[in-house]
Amino acid sequence: MSLLRNRLQDLPALCLCVLVLACIGACQSEAYEGTPSPPPKLKMSHWSLVTGRMKELLEPVVNRTRDRWQWFWSPSTFRGFMQTYYDDHLRDLGPRTKAWLLKSKESLLNKTHSLCPRIVCGDKDQG
């Protein structure tokens, strides 16, 4: 128990140290913001090598896929797709949303009223 009491007495000093360290860290990060980054040759790390290799492997695949799907992104095809999607899914979105909200509201009110006598009001039969 005395160990816990000693630690509680040291808590304000510990908080002060943490606050001072946080301020020092913030001041140092502000000081480093204006310094230029190291040249790219000095920046090379294992992760940058992995990233470079992945980019090297995936770039041809991405380019081939982009070339194959180029027909889809032409204005007439894309416009047709969007018009069909709108007609199928979004044209009556406003009325459907309003109906869903009203139904959800009624359902929630019914559940609330059914719970009220048991929780808040007690049973009406025991009056």
UniProtKB/Swiss-Prot annotation:
The lineage of its organism: Eukaryota, Metazoa, Chordata, Craniata, Vertebrata. It comes from Chlorocebus sabaeus. This is Apolipoprotein C-IV. Residues 1-27 form the signal peptide. The keyword Secreted applies. Keywords: Lipid transport, Secreted, Signal, Transport. InterPro entries: APOC4. Coiled coil: none annotated. One of its GO terms (biological process) is positive regulation of triglyceride storage.
